[in-house]
């Protein structure tokens, strides 16, 4: 039995299938961890969700910002933007089945025997792993609650509040928790977010660092696998931090990581989100 983690799919199904074939992935015995952003911008968002649903018993999945955006558009189609490639999912005959599965996924996964956490964007430096799991569970509970789901999805958009406080309540509390787990790149040591800068490390605003680069980060004893930040190209010079979004949908690559052996497989991609000829290699990003 092998366990793999894969970077942001964003509706790019063929590179995923190429990687799984190369790794001899067997859904009957192996496990696949997904760092979120399963859909959007790529050519096969609906097919990707259907494929994942078909092997759902082999998956561990955390939600990304694009997945939450899809759930919001499911409840209010006016949320769709020109650049979104999500309408076919909303209009699909099996949409309700797919959405019900999607909303039951996690924001943060922790594999205690391995000492490894997986999250889409990151864990802010001021939270312990225990605190992060506790707050992730608050949002996960709302996602699975028919009575509160729509209110949360309507209110989750926005950059404020930009810092956690235990005194936050209601949708503002849920929004900042969501932003940490699904949108964060740069923050201060006390967790104040900058959600505008989206490029590489050199684009850090004054007084801000990548969330994983704060020396007193309270989750530093835990190995963390994350996606979201394609501009990093998978390069993070911090022990125990594994970045897997290597920009497949932008003409970069899709990266598969063996959680136990540390081996990487990479599939180089076209800007259309399809594999390049002779695209597979075993180089670390």
Curated annotation (Swiss-Prot):
Entry GO MF terms: bis(5'-nucleosyl)-tetraphosphatase (symmetrical) activity
Annotated InterPro entries: ApaH (IPR004617), Calcineurin-like_PHP_ApaH (IPR004843), Metallo-depent_PP-like (IPR029052)
Enzyme class (EC, first level): hydrolase
Alphabetical UniProt keywords: Hydrolase
EC number(s) given by UniProt: 3.6.1.41
One Pfam family matching this protein: Metallophos
Catalyzed reaction equations: P(1),P(4)-bis(5'-adenosyl) tetraphosphate + H2O = 2 ADP + 2 H(+)
Keyword field contains Hydrolase: yes
CDD domains named in the record: MPP_ApaH
PANTHER family tied to this protein: CYTOCHROME C5, PTHR40942
HAMAP family in alphabetical order: ApaH (MF_00199)
Purpose: Hydrolyzes diadenosine 5',5'''-P1,P4-tetraphosphate to yield ADP.
Family (UniProt): Belongs to the Ap4A hydrolase family.
Record protein name field: Bis(5'-nucleosyl)-tetraphosphatase, symmetrical
